[in-house]
Each structure stands twice: as C-alpha cells, then as structure tokens.
Amino acid sequence: DPKTTLTGDFTFEQIPVDAWRGNFDLNLVGGVLLPCQEFCPAMLQSGRGSVINIASVSAHIPLSRVIAYSAAKAAVLSLSQFLAREWAAAGVRVNTITPGFFPAEQNRKILFHEDGSPTARTESIMGHTPMGRFGEADELIGAAVFLASHQASSFVTGSDIRVDGGFLSQTI
C-alpha cells in the first residue's frame, strides 16, 4: 500500500504522491495535529500539561529511500517547536523524542533476513551507532516518563530528546 510505504525501491522522482500524503497524514496530521487539537485545549485551560511527540533520526538526517517519511518527521519537529513557543506561557510544555533504531514489526523485513540474520542495512546502522546495538522499548519509556513528569521536567519545553545510541553524533 503506497499510503503506508516507509521504504521502497524508489528514486525521489518515482515516489508516488500517495506515499507523500500517506506519510504526512499518518505522522503529522494523525500523530500530532489532530491529537493536539483534541486534547490540548483542556491543558491550556488548566495551565499545565506535557505534549510528547515522536520524531525520527531520519528527520535530522534524511535517509535514502525514506524521504517522504523523513520529511513528515521533520515537520513533526517543526510543529512541536512552534507549539512549545506558542503554549509555554500557558504552562503547557511540548517536546519530542527522537528514537534511533528499534526493531519493530514494520521494519523487520529491511533489518533482518528470513533466517534472522542481519541485512547489510542493519550492519550499516550498527556501524554508525556508537553504542553498536538497537534500542529497547524501556529506553524510550524512560525518556517519555521524564518528559511527562512535571517535577522532573517543568522547565523543559521545545526540546528533542535523542534516544539513538549516539547515531546522530556520527557523520554519515
């Protein structure tokens, strides 16, 4: 389904418009815009709240073959920074978490062969990740708990917490 395609054997010129729309609908409209419009008025009225949006390392460094996804995630970062400035005076904090590479069902086919051995892409990712491994769900949860805690992060807004094993510290 081109609307949910995150990767593919397309050059930039070949990426279907539906893939662009699908990525922006899923990641920006469905993942940030609509939830913020639905839930943030109550936070703004109460004078307190924390919005945590999910970006991607590919928002910072657009990766080959996933440019529609990269652009949508870069838009998540941009909108989150705007909302952080817009809502800070009302007491609502807006931050992002940028995950590195976490094995998930949606990317298993590009990371591992059917026999479970790593693909060339996995070996490349690990070679560019100083910690030399994939992330684990608990590591993302820890960042989210920190950002959600008023006590721990009441002065944190407009920030991007990178949970990427150092991936973005490397030059690709």
Model-predicted segments: where are they?
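Catalytic Tyr-X3-Lys loop
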Residues: 6-33, 52, 76, 131
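A glycine/serine/threonine-rich, flexible loop-to-helix segment
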Residues: 10, 89, 101-128, 170-172
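Active-site helix of classical SDR
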Residues: 36, 72, 80
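Alpha-helical segment proximal to the catalytic Tyr-Lys
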Residues: 41, 85-89, 154
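Residue(s) in the substrate-gating loop at a strand-loop-helix junction
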Residues: 56
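Short C-terminal tail/terminal secondary-structure segment
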Residues: 61, 131, 145, 151-172
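Active-site loop-to-helix junction immediately N-terminal to the catalytic Tyr of the SDR YXXXK motif
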Residues: 62-70, 82, 110
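A conserved structural motif in NAD(P)-dependent oxidoreductases
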Residues: 116-117, 129-140
